[in-house]
Amino acid sequence: MKIKFINHASVLINVNGVNLISDPWLFGSTFYDGWSLISKSCQVDWGEIDYVWISHEHPDHFHVPSIKSIPEKYKANITFLYQSTMDNKVNNWLKSQNFKVKLLPNLKKIKIASNVFIKSGKTPQDDSWLLIDDGKTKFLNLNDCETKSKQFKFIMKKFAREIGRVDILASQFGFASYLGYNQTIRKKSAQSVLDKVDYQIEVLKPKYYIPFASFSYFSHKENFLQNKENNSVFDVHDFLLKKRRTLPVVLYPGDTWIPYKSHNNNSALEKYKKDYNNAFQKPLNDNTKKYNLNFLKQKSLEYKEKIIKKNVFLK
């Protein structure tokens, strides 16, 4: 198994002749210009890609512009992997773009190559994780999955019993929500994410941890202030070294690592140091359209009615 870091929550896994990439957000901003990538993504050779796994619908994972940038000539050879959902929205959209889609059954092993199996599981808030197992190495992409709720703690412990020790864990290390102007709340939220990572490591006991799914920054005039308290890759790296439960493997876009081979984090950390500094010096996004409060209230009521009509459980 080879692991190549692309950016943010995107890694390219090469195993037994198969190439699987996750959550490609390769360029541009997202969340209405509220988030931007800290570093420039490395190039993806779509002609080599067999599978694209999408964890959930948030635009830093299901990034429509990046998916639309895939050349038409490669689409026939690429299969998207996604969780089965009631609305089929992502599935239908991908098919409309001429992609093949395979919906993954919850907690079921699927063979994708000789001696290579994947397993996907749903979690609260419509997220999902992916386990890749080649018989020698188990790589778990947990991305943004909620692991502190009672429901997921139960699932995760059961999951750990089923699969045994995970060799490599990749998960989110920074908060993503808008937390307002209360500095204390932001600090507590940042610490809670590190505590969540520590809990994941306690239960799953990975040999290695790859900092993941948090290589973006708040890039809009209205949310930039939140960067001050959020966790950086340096914070999670130091946190893990102090805890001594696992070995952090910090990868920079374009870095390739073979599990159980030695890896020096210093090169990646030095590059990220420059990128963080550069990102925070860039002009802030401020081209969001402004609307008056009454207009927004009316639109929210219309949206509420639309959701009720489309959701059988709310009728």
Language model segments and positions:
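Pre-active-site segment of Zn-dependent metallo-hydrolases
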Residues: 18-57, 64-72, 147-164
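Metallo-beta-lactamase
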Residues: 75, 80-137, 237-238
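Active-site environment of divalent metal-dependent phosphoester hydrolases
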Residues: 28-29, 58-62, 86-90, 108-111, ...
